[in-house]
């Protein structure tokens, strides 16, 4: 009986959503007939559940999307997770949705995600308030603002690498720790370190419940996550209060509490927590894939190591620390980052929702339908990237065609922290490539799919510091 009740609790919300979305699907079809425009080609699958089972029956969801694209073309309809959807997989269509007609498509997230991160976070906004938040975040994470952070980021990188030395670790989990520490530094600066450990613990509890069923009952992951979110908000509110009294700080929090920005404490807290969320897993995923790809391609690793050794030798001779200018000289390593983001395509797609009926290339996208630009399909299109499955950083010696490479999204909702993400990758690999060796078990090959595509089991790796006489 207990198992049955649990089954009902888990399944009932999904069935309710399916039923509501099923009615919307029928409404969309009727609207298409009424206005004389056809829906995009495709299949809506079974009543209520659509093609959800087909999507998840494949260990690799990209197989599902590729099959649909090959059959129907770069724009097609489907029905997954209770939602009628239009998938777009051409650079032109992605630009239409994310840039030129972005006002017709709003970002969409489950209500439970908004509750966890905070309803006033930048992800969930449009219009003037979103533009205001984006200006603040972009200013705080601009090259001019983060260039002075190199020594502090380098210190975090060195501590991380030292803790891995001689250990067999889960690479993804260690990269998440590194990315979280950099995120907290960039948000709060170095003056709020006394709160950092409690912030981390609350955030980690929140993260565990992020993809859980939103059932707020004692003992559930969701309930624990919401308690952690409340405590996290209280800690951030305390830090905000102290910072307002000081009225200084070149970090993100300093930008938020600037009296000219007119943000409430609740708005600031939601956005601080949202930025922590955005800054952690995606960056850690790219770093994990970089370790994997460099280990699989010795010639590329050799080129990266030689580039970094040249910079390291110059730093040693001058007695100066690593600087922002040094990271601008890391051309080969930067191309490795780009190619890693293309091949791995950490963000395979993004969700939007049509706010009104939209016509695109003679097709109707009905109001309320989800629209998913498929970044991975665009990044793996051989018309734009020959031999797309091959890891070849040299392809970025020439800039890709517009809208064919969108690792940070595109338009007003693209990632405003992309320069910080690239900086922390460059700093970490400067020391990793010059000072450490790594290896993994051959049995650990493979890919696992969750919110992000990752090497199997988070890429367990052994890291060992090189001897001083080794290159």
From Swiss-Prot:
Enzyme nomenclature, EC number: 1.14.14.137
Predominant place of localization: endoplasmic reticulum
UniProt key word Lipoprotein: no
Cellular component aspect of the GO annotation: endoplasmic reticulum membrane
Recorded GO MF terms: (+)-abscisic acid 8'-hydroxylase activity; heme binding; iron ion binding; oxidoreductase activity, acting on paired donors, with incorporation or reduction of molecular oxygen, NAD(P)H as one donor, and incorporation of one atom of oxygen
Catalytic activities: 2-cis-(+)-abscisate + reduced [NADPH--hemoprotein reductase] + O2 = (+)-8'-hydroxyabscisate + oxidized [NADPH--hemoprotein reductase] + H2O + H(+)
One of the GO biological process terms: abscisic acid metabolic process
This protein's UniProt keywords: Endoplasmic reticulum, Heme, Iron, Membrane, Metal-binding, Monooxygenase, Oxidoreductase, Stress response, Transmembrane, Transmembrane helix
Induction (free text): By ethylene treatment and by flooding.
One Pfam short name: p450
InterPro entries: Cyt_P450, Cyt_P450_CS, Cyt_P450_E_grp-I, Cyt_P450_sf
Family: Belongs to the cytochrome P450 family.
Protein name, per record: Abscisic acid 8'-hydroxylase 1
Organism this protein belongs to: Oryza sativa subsp. japonica (Rice)
